């Protein structure tokens, strides 16, 4: 039997609450029936939670397999200047680093950095140009 601080127990049939005194002062059959209903309700809730967890884990496994295979494809690994990893100096082929999937460059959602570096060093402020 599930007791709470304010002496109220949930009635699974009515989706409401009943005072505990009605069950405690009632006969044994009635209290046994309420206990069985509550335990079956809890079992159903646990089964639903387990099913949701199993579906989530299956979905995550499936998506992990899809992303890992997508990153190993030759077509998506080297995109050249169309890659977000493309840089004419250090990555002219536009290859993705190990463990990352290569994504085509989209100027609307991604902005490439310029060669100029901005730094703020104590009293020095402004743009510093480094030799290439």
Curated annotation (Swiss-Prot):
UniProt similarity note: Belongs to the AIM4 family.
UniProt-recorded name of the protein: Altered inheritance of mitochondria protein 4
Keyword Cytoplasm tagged: yes
Region Disordered: start-end pairs: 1-103
Keyword hit for Cytoplasm: yes
Biased composition (Polar residues): 60-70
Keywords, alphabetical: Cytoplasm
Domain of life: Eukaryota
GO CC term, one of those recorded: cytoplasm
Skewed-composition ranges (Basic and acidic residues): 8-20, 27-45
Protein localization: Cytoplasm
Any single Pfam family the record assigns to this protein: NpwBP
């Amino acid at each position: 039997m599930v007791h709470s601080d304010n002496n109220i127990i949930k009635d699974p049939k009515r989706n409401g609450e009943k005072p505990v005194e009605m069950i405690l002062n009632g006969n044994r059959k009635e209290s046994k029936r309420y206990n069985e209903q509550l335990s079956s309700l809890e079992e159903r809730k646990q089964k639903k939670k387990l099913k949701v967890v199993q579906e989530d884990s299956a979905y995550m496994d499936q998506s992990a397999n899809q992303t890992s295979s997508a990153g190993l494809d030759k077509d998506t690994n080297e995109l050249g200047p169309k890659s977000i990893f493309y840089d004419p100096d250090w990555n002219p082929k536009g290859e993705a680093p190990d463990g990352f999937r290569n994504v085509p460059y989209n100027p609307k959602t991604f902005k490439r950095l310029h060669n100029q570096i901005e730094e703020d060093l104590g009293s020095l402020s402004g743009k510093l140009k480094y030799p290439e």
